[in-house]
UniProtKB/Swiss-Prot annotation:
Keywords: Membrane, Mitochondrion, Mitochondrion inner membrane, Signal-anchor, Transmembrane, Transmembrane helix
GO biological process: mitochondrial cytochrome c oxidase assembly; mitochondrial respiratory chain complex III assembly
InterPro entries found in the cross-reference section: BRAWNIN
Topological region Mitochondrial intermembrane: 26-71
GO cellular component, one term: mitochondrial inner membrane
Protein name: Ubiquinol-cytochrome c reductase complex assembly factor 6
Record organism: Pongo abelii (Sumatran orangutan)
Length: 71
């Protein structure tokens, strides 16, 4: 096994790591409960909290790298 660790110790660490990962995911999922409701009327533009503000209309031109200018 890696670094000379016995197989039993390796499997115990693997099991403990997986258990901790699953427990952490469960706690986070219970704390941040997803909103699974589906509205009958779709929300108007801008009402969704998940809408990215960076994708809206830009006020300035994006910078072009020097490599792209040379092409």
């Amino acid at each position: 096994m890696p670094a000379g660790v016995p197989m039993s110790t390796y499997l115990k660490m693997l099991a403990a790591s997986l258990l901790a990962m699953c427990a952490g995911a469960e706690v986070v999922h219970r704390y941040y409960r997803p909103d699974l409701t589906i509205p009958e009327i779709p929300p108007k533009r801008g009402e969704l909290k998940t809408e990215l503000l960076g994708l809206k209309e830009r006020k300035h031109k994006p910078q072009i790298s020097q490599q792209e200018e040379l092409k």
